């Protein structure tokens, strides 16, 4: 099965390379006209600026401690002690802990679950 996969991969690579040469040779022989982008100047101002690093990490992104995670209830969960850390969902206690120790990305309010409240 592995050999079959390798053979198919090689055939696909050869096909892609040969079809690329056909397009290049046709272009050099003036059989294909180059496509001119009429609106290139119009969209020049709309190109995105370089992205700055965010001050907090979204769910699933790498983190070092709870204060790196964006959400109020997000916690930094690490495998094998301090390795392979990423932001995951926490709970109300996580929010309170972040409120006490974090100077940046400090939660303004901690959401409480409506499941435990008594009605009536």
Curated annotation (Swiss-Prot):
<feature type="disulfide bond">
    <location>
        <begin position="78"/>
        <end position="85"/>
    </location>
</feature>
<feature type="signal peptide">
    <location>
        <begin position="1"/>
        <end position="16"/>
    </location>
</feature>
<dbReference type="GO" id="GO:0090729">
    <property type="term" value="F:toxin activity"/>
</dbReference>
<feature type="domain" description="Agouti">
    <location>
        <begin position="56"/>
        <end position="95"/>
    </location>
</feature>
<feature type="disulfide bond">
    <location>
        <begin position="56"/>
        <end position="70"/>
    </location>
</feature>
<keyword id="KW-1015">Disulfide bond</keyword>
<feature type="disulfide bond">
    <location>
        <begin position="63"/>
        <end position="76"/>
    </location>
</feature>
<dbReference type="GO" id="GO:0005576">
    <property type="term" value="C:extracellular region"/>
</dbReference>
<keyword id="KW-0732">Signal</keyword>
<comment type="similarity">
    <text>Belongs to the neurotoxin 05 (agouti) family.</text>
</comment>
<keyword id="KW-0964">Secreted</keyword>
<protein>
    <recommendedName>
        <fullName>U13-lycotoxin-Ls1a</fullName>
    </recommendedName>
</protein>
<keyword id="KW-0960">Knottin</keyword>
<feature type="disulfide bond">
    <location>
        <begin position="69"/>
        <end position="87"/>
    </location>
</feature>
<keyword id="KW-0800">Toxin</keyword>
<feature type="propeptide">
    <location>
        <begin position="17"/>
        <end position="54"/>
    </location>
</feature>
């Amino acid at each position: 099965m592995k050999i079959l996969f390798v053979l198919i991969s090689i055939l696909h690579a050869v096909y892609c390379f040969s079809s690329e040469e056909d397009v290049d040779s046709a272009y050099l022989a003036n059989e294909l006209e180059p496509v001119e982008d009429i609106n290139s100047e119009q969209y020049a101002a709309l190109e995105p600026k370089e992205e700055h690093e965010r001050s907090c990490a979204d769910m699933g992104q790498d983190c070092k401690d709870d204060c790196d995670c964006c959400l109020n209830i997000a916690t930094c969960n690490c495998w094998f002690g301090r390795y392979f850390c990423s932001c995951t969902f926490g709970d109300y206690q996580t929010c309170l802990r972040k409120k006490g120790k974090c100077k940046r990305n400090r939660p303004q309010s901690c959401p409480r679950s409506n499941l435990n409240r008594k009605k009536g």
